[in-house]
């Protein structure tokens, strides 16, 4: 793209006398004559003041806008809806979380393409923000990237760091009588001290480090804290990055290849990341038109050891990574140990290895990133299984188990509250495979059921039961968890037919999950598409694909 035509799209409006009425609006914005030849960049801003993850998004957007201006570009913030994955936990509001990702993608696509922007920067604040903007970039293929709003700093109580995970773990402890409400209240008051996304390897940070590994997020962006000089400096540099991208003529679809998606998968596995990251990668591959599915993910994760000790599997936070040297340091290490392919191009460099070349080496004796040849675990916490219970796949995360096999009998629930009650009443015992169904994308938007996994994380059950569901879990969850079971119950998937007492066999390294129906096939309840009063959920249910395709719009899929 020649330097004089960096406004490659907006010039349709700014350099044509046929659009004189539009020019009147531009002059009303305070433009001068020279502004009509400047590239216009949309800044996707998920405004949401009541959510800690997003409360500073307007200020982050303003800093990005200033950086674009310093580079001779015109930056304009535009708003998209955002749903807090924490505030919507444990009630029907959680049904909005995953649909919000698709709404963000459509909103950003609509605004940027209709206004003829020359590029887009999407701000990643809460879990579904960054994935939504990434999908929008695949659709429009506009020059651009995702920039993280930054991670929250840890809270502190009695000299010990706290995260949001401690709140849910303490809540579970109170429910089984091993802690007190007074102690829980103190943890609640001190766990979240300010702005930023959840500070552990939950969904927000999983997507951030995956996007750095895939080349769609600038170096250090995922690990820089939300409140700090580094984040503001990074925002100011956004203009320099965007100008380089425009001059080079780079487009997002140029870098979202099978090799890049493999890198993102390996990064999620090596870091002990969230299952939601895999769901979004499936969506990204589908939107980008890349032939990359759960079978590919299965093959990659089988060969990936766990190199990071982030919570919830360990104790580390993104602030710990930031203090050590940031995400580029981790990427550089994973390239050196053979987990990541350093040759893939990024939006910011000719190769990923070049992008992180100046990053420091991991410190000796640190307790966050394992040295070469000494991983924390020989196989990834996350594995993909197929079989009679999940013909199209299920995503497992088993941070609390070293044994890759599990055999147990089903205990089935069609309601998450009944599951939690069963835990408190002692009905769920070690050896059970807890089946929660009828909560998939078509049934109710595929909400996160952190309340269920928290209930199962008590000392009596943690690592001693398995959890299988057609819905999602929060990235702060831990235990033996299988989610995104495809097909879901609402479309007639086998999970709808499991009965209490049915044997279920899981072998993570073989990638198998099988179920013995004992010769009886009868529905375990009434499972159907959402038909309630929320219109956006009806629209989502009518248009959404299954989890193995990333829950994108069905119109993107071929008919075969």
Name each model feature, range by range.
Residues 101, 123-126:
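N-terminal glycine-rich "phosphate-gripper" loop used for MgATP/nucleotide binding
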Residues 104-115:
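Short, well-structured alpha-helical segments in soluble
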Residues 97-105:
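Well-ordered mid-protein domain cores that form the structural environment of catalytic cofactors
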Residues 114-119, 431-433:
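Short, surface-exposed connector motifs at secondary-structure boundaries
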Residues 119-122, 199:
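Short catalytic-loop micro-motif centered on adjacent basic/acidic residues
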Residues 1-55, 60-81, 86-97, 126, ...:
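Catalytic or ion-coupling anion/metal-binding cores of large enzyme and transporter domains
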């Amino acid at each position: 793209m020649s330097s004089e035509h960096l406004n490659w799209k907006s010039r349709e409006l700014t350099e044509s006398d046929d659009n004189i009425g539009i020019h009147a609006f531009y002059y009303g914005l305070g433009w001068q004559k020279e502004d009509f030849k400047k590239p216009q960049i949309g800044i996707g801003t998920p405004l949401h003041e009541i959510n800690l993850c997003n409360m500073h998004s307007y200020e982050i957007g303003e800093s990005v806008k200033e950086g674009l201006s310093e580079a001779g570009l015109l930056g304009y913030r535009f708003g998209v809806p955002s749903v807090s994955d924490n505030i919507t936990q444990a009630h029907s509001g959680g049904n909005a979380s995953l649909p919000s990702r698709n709404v963000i993608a459509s909103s950003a696509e609509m605004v940027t393409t209709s206004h003829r922007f020359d590029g887009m920067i999407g701000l990643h604040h809460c879990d579904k923000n960054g994935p939504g903007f990434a999908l929008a970039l695949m659709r429009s293929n506009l020059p651009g990237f995702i920039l993280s709003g930054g991670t929250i700093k840890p809270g502190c109580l009695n000299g010990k760091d706290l995260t949001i995970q401690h709140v849910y773990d303490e809540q579970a402890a109170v429910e089984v009588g091993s802690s007190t409400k007074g102690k829980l209240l103190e943890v609640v008051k001190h766990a979240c001290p300010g702005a930023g996304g959840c500070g552990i390897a939950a969904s927000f940070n999983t997507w951030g480090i995956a996007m750095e590994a895939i080349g769609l997020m600038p170096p250090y962006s995922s690990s820089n804290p939300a409140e700090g000089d580094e984040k503001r400096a990074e925002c100011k540099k956004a203009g320099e990055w965007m100008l380089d991208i425009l001059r080079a003529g780079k487009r997002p679809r140029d870098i979202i290849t099978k090799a890049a998606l493999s890198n993102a998968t390996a990064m999620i596995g090596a870091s002990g990341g969230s299952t939601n990251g895999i769901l979004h990668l499936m969506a990204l591959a589908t939107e980008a038109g890349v032939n990359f599915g759960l079978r590919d993910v299965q093959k990659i994760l089988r060969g990936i050891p766990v190199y990071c000790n982030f919570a919830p599997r360990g104790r580390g936070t993104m602030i710990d990574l930031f203090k050590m040297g940031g995400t580029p340091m981790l990427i550089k290490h994973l390239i050196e140990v053979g987990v990541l392919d350093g040759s893939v191009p990024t939006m910011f460099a000719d190769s990923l290895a070049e992008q992180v070349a100046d990053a420091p080496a991991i410190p000796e004796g640190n307790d966050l990133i394992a040295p070469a040849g000494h991983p924390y675990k020989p196989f990834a916490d996350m594995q993909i299984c197929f079989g009679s219970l999940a013909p199209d796949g299920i995503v497992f995360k088993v941070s609390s188990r070293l044994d890759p096999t599990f055999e147990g009998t089903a205990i089935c629930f069609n309601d998450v509250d009944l599951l939690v009650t069963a835990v408190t009443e002692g009905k769920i015992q070690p050896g059970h495979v807890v089946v929660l169904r009828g909560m998939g994308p078509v049934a109710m938007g595929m909400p996160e059921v952190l309340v269920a996994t928290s209930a199962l994380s008590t000392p009596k059950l943690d690592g001693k039961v398995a959890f299988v569901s057609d819905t999602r879990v929060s990235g702060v969850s831990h235990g033996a968890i299988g989610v995104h079971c495809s097909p879901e119950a609402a479309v007639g998937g086998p999970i709808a037919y499991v009965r209490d007492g049915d044997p279920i066999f899981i072998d993570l390294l073989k990638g198998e999950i099988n179920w013995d129906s004992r010769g009886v096939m009868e529905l375990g309840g009434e499972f159907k598409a959402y038909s309630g009063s929320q219109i956006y959920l009806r629209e989502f249910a009518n248009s959404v694909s299954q989890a193995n395709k990333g829950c994108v719009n069905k119109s993107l899929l071929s008919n075969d």
